[in-house]
Design a protein with these regions (language model features):
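Histidine-centered active-site loop/cap adjacent to the catalytic His
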Residues: 5-7, 244, 310-320, 333-338
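Serine-dependent acyl-ester chemistry module
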Residues: 156-309, 327-330
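Conserved beta-strand elements of the Class I
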Residues: 83-87, 121, 149-151
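Structural motif
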Residues: 126-137
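Hydrophobic membrane-insertion alpha-helices, especially the h-region
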Residues: 7-23
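Helix-to-loop transition at the C-terminal end of transmembrane segments
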Residues: 22-34, 274
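Membrane/wall-proximal cationic-aromatic binding patches
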Residues: 30-110, 114, 328-330
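Proline-aspartate-enriched helix->loop->beta-strand connector
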Residues: 141-150
Length: 338
């Protein structure tokens, strides 16, 4: 029995060593987080299918430049240009929109009419909250030093109160001792990096952090009394808001400390206590998740938007209040926030 155990251990060791060598030569898994660091997907392109899509294109084509961002290559006359990065989660990266169709692309076209010296790239990272934005800022944006960084934040920070976000694992304080060990191994081993990212993919799927279309007329309705609505709001107030405020203030501080002027954006959403003009559906009564509805979700998101608004006033940061400017009309959305 002992000899068999030794033989099995030797076989496993040889297999893992061979797998490690093979993955170091060629790794077919282009994961964008390794250990507690971001790996930008430089010079990568994706073709993403959306079976059964109605509002989204059935196939989207996404290209990343030498920086790992969406958009044009950085100009050689960098110091002479007005350089801008847009930073956010999936509502900024927009993997469900092909090249040229994101809001960053539209912003570039509009600014180019009056400022042809502008360079704008999309540094959005699907699934990231302000935890991930801080890592991106420290590891990449500070050294790149654009003149302006536009931050669209809020929605993914809500997920921290109810589900493990993709990027919470970028903060070692959020990890168990065992997971910290796996993170350390992922920094030094291709096999461990693949294993860790497969775990992240599973958790992301289970947390429902993904993009789908919403069929408003087919959704169930849910009525919540004031007591239940207030309980949902109080959970956000006690679990997430202060941390979000601290991280957003840190983003502003680091940006300005490094000569980058931040611009804040509030997060719009389709849900709210209104009637959708395109479908005549009462958005406030639509059931969202296992416990909430459109009215409660909008009130929850507005707690985070209010944090952004207050920081804009207190720190003198320019604000684009998109949450109040964008119409709640399903013509402009594929799901609740995209």
């Amino acid at each position: 029995m002992k000899r068999g155990a030794v033989r099995a251990a030797t076989t496993v060791t040889v297999f893992l060593a061979a797998l490690e060598i093979g993955l170091r030569i060629y790794n077919p898994f282009p994961f964008r987080v390794r250990g507690d660091h971001i790996v930008l997907p430089a010079h990568q392109s994706y073709t993403i299918s959306h079976p059964g899509a109605v509002r989204m294109d059935p196939v989207t084509h996404v290209t990343k430049n030498s920086l790992g961002f969406r958009g044009p290559e950085p100009p050689r006359d960098w110091s002479e240009r007005l350089t801008i990065l847009t930073i956010g989660g999936s509502t900024t990266e927009c993997l469900f929109l092909s090249d040229g169709k994101t809001w960053t692309d539209e912003l570039r076209r509009r600014i180019d009419v009056i400022r042809p010296d502008v360079w704008i790239d999309n540094a959005g990272f699907e699934g990231h909250s302000t935890f991930g934005h801080l890592v991106l800022l420290r590891e990449f944006v500070v050294s790149l030093r654009p003149k302006i960084a536009i931050f669209l934040t809020g929605y993914n920070d809500m997920k921290i109160a109810s589900a493990l976000p993709i990027d919470s694992e970028l903060n070692p304080h959020n990890l168990s001792a065992g997971h910290r060990a796996l993170t350390w191994m992922a920094d030094h081993s291709e096999v461990a990096a693949v294993a860790e990212n497969l775990i992240r993919m599973k958790r992301t799927y289970e947390a429902n952090v993904r993009t789908t279309e919403v069929d408003l007329p087919g959704l169930p309705r849910r009525t919540l009394d004031d007591e239940r609505t207030n309980a949902i709001l109080e959970e956000h107030r006690t679990k997430s808001l202060s941390g979000y405020a601290s991280r957003l203030a840190e983003i502003v501080r680091i940006s300005r400390q490094n000569g980058i002027e931040p611009i804040l954006m509030t997060q719009p959403a389709l849900y709210g206590d209104v009637i959708d003009p395109s479908s005549d559906v009462a958005l406030g009564a639509v059931a969202i998740g296992p416990l909430s509805n459109g009215r409660a979700e909008w009130q929850s998101l507005e707690l985070y938007n209010d944090v952004t608004r207050r920081l804009s006033v207190d720190a003198g940061v320019p604000l684009i209040d998109l949450a109040r400017e964008m119409p709640k009309d399903s013509r402009y959305f594929t799901d609740w926030v995209h």
